[in-house]
Amino acid sequence: CLDFNALKRIDEMSDIVAASPGRKIMIDHHLYPEDFCRITISHPEISSTSELVFRLICRMGYFSDISKEGAECIYTGMMTDTGGFTYNSNNREIYFIISELLSKGIDKDDIYRKVYNTYSESRLRLMGYVLSNMVVYSDYNAALISLTKEEQSKFDYIKGDSEGFVNIPLTIKNVCFSCFLREDTEKPMIKISLRSVGTF
């Protein structure tokens, strides 16, 4: 079980995973892991689960077996989980790991372009729409963005289109807390994403 620490995080698959007689191993960096795995490797102080996987591979003595493709996957996970190394990334060991991944022949600049600079036109227009309706609460150093089911339909929303939206308000000077409310397109529920910086 990678990068999730509670069965409820995997929605419909939770019952299947819970009922599976297979041995379960959790590798994760989120706080308060649930006790549903035989082995739990949980380190919230680590920046990403991908970094944790890399450390585990090296601890077991298999660094030489990491392929270029494997190194690309690890780097991509580290990069996306830290917002392009803009938060939770002050540990100097992260950059030692990156240098080790570079030794496998990865092109980190190309990976960045493919992850962050290949969006569809509709996603970009959706982002503009969401930001144009953003509400900033200056007295609280906070911002709120939202997206209804109807609005998603208007912009031909596909799963993942709003990934990272919650981080954008944090680029506003003095905004330390961001909340993103998105109406689910399949279930009668609203998904809430929260982000903060500093000591908010």
Name each model feature, range by range.
Residues 2-5, 27-30, 56, 82, ...:
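Fold-independent oxyanion-binding glycine-rich loops
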Residues 1-3, 28, 77, 145-148, ...:
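Short beta-strand segments
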